[in-house]
Amino acid sequence: MDLNMNAKDQIELVDATPPSNVTIDNKCGKCTKSICCNSINQKIPTPKSKEDFDHLLWQVSHENINVFKDADGWFLHIFTNCSHLLPGGVCGIYENRPWVCREYTNDFCEFDESIKDASELWFSSHKKLEKYCRKRFKKWKKRFEIYK
């Protein structure tokens, strides 16, 4: 397993269709890429103003950062590998793993459907988010006037 894969490779990884014989009980064992350990989803406040979206533009301008909205709200999706992931996709600190890892459930995870496909909105670049902002705010280009 290549823990230094780029974001494009990671997107292809999560877009893969799972085998049909996968159940909740055997899903983690069939996930050879440790998909859940290759990204972080950080919930963010719902962006409402031009200033909020301008800040998101700055964030999504960085490598391996996406912004998405789903039924649970808005999130930053950060592609980054867990430093404890060993070759073969197993956790190197399993007995001492953080609580968030212990609470994680595989009832429905990226092995079933990629976050990108399950999202209502998905922005992987400045260009895509700015296009959305121009539609959402009629005076989007005038947002810089607040800084004058």
Task: Label each region the model flagged.
Residues M1-K148:
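Short loop/turn segments that flank or connect secondary-structure elements
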